[in-house]
């Protein structure tokens, strides 16, 4: 018995000594004092992006941490982000650190978001950009986005009329409405099914699917010690068992959806297109590859868009002058006789600025998705050894007072400075940057901007009287609003025309 206790401890001591001796060879960025074996894991209390910002204030725009046996480098500077995401550095830094969640949920790190840099990832990226997320294909699915937004507006209008016959303001909770909108948008594009609202398919499966997406986001954002202290696996791992069960449940749903699309040979969905490619190249387009692409689309395009919309509406309610300015722009440019369309977004710069300001203050991936270099490299003059976990604290960059005037203020007018979009490339990074930029960025921006513009155009909005809005963020990969958004709304006259 004593042998089985001492052997792991001996292994831990040897590993620590080995790691420490290797560290001495490198000129690593500065960082706070660490504890033996655990490093800084004991300090990682949520919200982690705020903690990392405090460390950057103390140690500078690049600093080191240690999570168990893993080195971590945190970047909090646009210039260092640019250095990391351009040229040869971007190639070296285009891999992902291996994590338990990705192992069991993302088909052993083979999805576009989790795969190591190499031929397989490049193929997946090409499929995303050319086959399922191309401008042509997004235009083909425009009718789905338009239909789902109209359904949401109609549902909200009927609810206000049912709850309030005097046409006064009605109290609503926005999170379920926005969540149903974004889930239906993506699931219809991917599989052709509607899960939420009216005319739905399989409510039980729908609720399980939404729960799994939420669980995956929470577990992906978890700073779990088993990822950094492998020796803990010898003592059993509840986290690993839970993640494995989540991955199995998600795979079961994805396989059912794939089989349904395979039976529907006339379907015009992203999955049907991938099935046609599978028939041409069965050796590459396996079911696992297709399910991985399905999951990537659904995880990246559902929860994230709903969270962004909720933050946007929260900020508009806290800043009624911004809401009024956005509404006036829509009324002036679009009129009051028809619903805003995707083609109108180009002539609504203030609405676009509102979305950009929401991305700045409330990025759904506050420190992006971590990367890991495939070779030793340098950033900011410091050594970054191979396999280091590199995190870019976009949340802190977005709120840096040296970059942004009054950084905590929600001010869409700040983008009217004439600097142009290139000026903000490494100052505003809600979708990441470089080779691992989110391939669904264009789709996400379309959904968020069109839905937000429609809510502004079709309803009057007020904050709930007597309630002080809590703007705290929750834990997890997607930076949800801790307290679900409640608001008062009333249909504008345009809604009566839309419902005719």
Swiss-Prot record:
Topology of the protein relative to the lipid bilayer: Single-pass membrane protein
Gene Ontology cellular component annotations, sorted alphabetically: endoplasmic reticulum; membrane
Record localization: Membrane
Protein name listed in UniProt: Cytochrome P450 81F1
E.C. designation(s): 1.14.-.-
Numbered residues of crosslink Glycyl lysine isopeptide (Lys-Gly) (interchain with G-Cter in ubiquitin): 248
A Pfam family of this chain: p450
Family: Belongs to the cytochrome P450 family.
Cofactor: heme
GO function terms (MF aspect): heme binding; iron ion binding; monooxygenase activity; oxidoreductase activity, acting on paired donors, with incorporation or reduction of molecular oxygen
Task of the protein: Involved in indole glucosinolate biosynthesis. Catalyzes hydroxylation reactions of the glucosinolate indole ring. Converts indol-3-yl-methylglucosinolate (I3M) to 4-hydroxy-indol-3-yl-methylglucosinolate (4OH-I3M) and/or 1-hydroxy-indol-3-yl-methylglucosinolate (1OH-I3M) intermediates. These hydroxy intermediates are converted to 4-methoxy-indol-3-yl-methylglucosinolate (4MO-I3M) and 1-methoxy-indol-3-yl-methylglucosinolate (1MO-I3M) by indole glucosinolate methyltransferase 1 and 2 (IGMT1 and IGMT2).
Signal sequence coordinates: none
Residues bound to heme: 438
């Amino acid at each position: 018995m004593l042998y089985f206790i001492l052997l792991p401890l001996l292994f831990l001591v040897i590993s620590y000594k080995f790691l420490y001796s290797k560290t001495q060879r490198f000129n690593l960025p500065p960082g706070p004092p660490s504890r033996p074996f655990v490093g800084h894991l004991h300090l990682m209390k949520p919200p982690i992006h705020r903690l990392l910002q405090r460390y950057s204030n103390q140690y500078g725009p690049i600093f080191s941490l240690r999570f168990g046996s893993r080195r971590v480098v945190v970047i909090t500077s646009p210039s260092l982000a640019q250095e990391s995401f351009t040229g040869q550095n971007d190639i070296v830094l285009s891999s992902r650190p291996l994590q338990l969640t990705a192992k069991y949920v993302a088909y052993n790190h083979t999805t576009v978001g989790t795969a190591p840099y190499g031929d397989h990832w490049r193929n997946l990226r090409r499929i995303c950009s050319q086959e399922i997320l191309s401008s042509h294909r997004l235009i083909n699915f425009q009718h789905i986005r338009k239909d789902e937004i109209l359904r949401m507006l109609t549902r909200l209008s009927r609810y206000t009329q049912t709850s309030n016959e005097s046409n006064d303001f009605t109290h609503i909770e926005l999170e379920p409405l926005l969540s149903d909108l974004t889930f239906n948008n993506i699931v219809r594009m991917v599989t052709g099914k509607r899960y939420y609202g009216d005319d739905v398919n399989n409510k039980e499966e729908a609720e399980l699917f939404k729960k799994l997406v939420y669980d995956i986001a929470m577990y992906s954002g978890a700073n779990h010690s088993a990822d950094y202290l492998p020796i803990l696996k010898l003592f059993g791992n509840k986290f690993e068992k839970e993640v494995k069960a989540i991955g199995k449940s998600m795979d079961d749903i994805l396989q059912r959806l794939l089989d349904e699309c395979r039976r529907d040979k006339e379907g015009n969905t992203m999955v049907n297109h991938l099935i046609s490619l599978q028939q041409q190249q069965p050796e590459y387009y396996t079911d696992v590859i297709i399910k991985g692409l399905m999951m990537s689309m659904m995880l990246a395009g559902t929860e994230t868009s709903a969270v962004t919309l909720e933050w946007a509406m929260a900020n508009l309610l806290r800043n009624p002058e911004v809401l009024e300015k956005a509404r006036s722009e829509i009324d002036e440019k679009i009129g009051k006789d028809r619903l805003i369309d995707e083609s109108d977004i180009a002539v609504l710069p203030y609405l676009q600025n509102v979305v950009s300001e929401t991305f700045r203050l409330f990025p759904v991936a506050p420190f992006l998705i971590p990367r890991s270099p495939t070779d030793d490299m340098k950033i900011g003059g410091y050594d970054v050894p191979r396999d280091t976990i590199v995190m870019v604290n976009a949340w802190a960059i977005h709120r840096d007072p040296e970059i942004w005037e009054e950084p905590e203020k929600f001010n869409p007018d700040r983008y009217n400075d004439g600097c142009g979009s290139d000026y903000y490339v490494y100052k505003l990074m809600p979708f990441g940057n470089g080779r691992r930029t989110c391939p669904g960025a264009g789709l996400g921006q379309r959904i968020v901007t069109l839905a937000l513009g429609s809510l502004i155009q079709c309803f009057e909005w007020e904050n709930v009287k007597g309630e002080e809005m809590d703007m705290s963020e929750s834990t997890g990969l997607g930076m949800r609003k801790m307290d679900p958004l409640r608001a008062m709304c009333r249909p504008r006259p345009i809604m009566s025309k839309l419902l005719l």
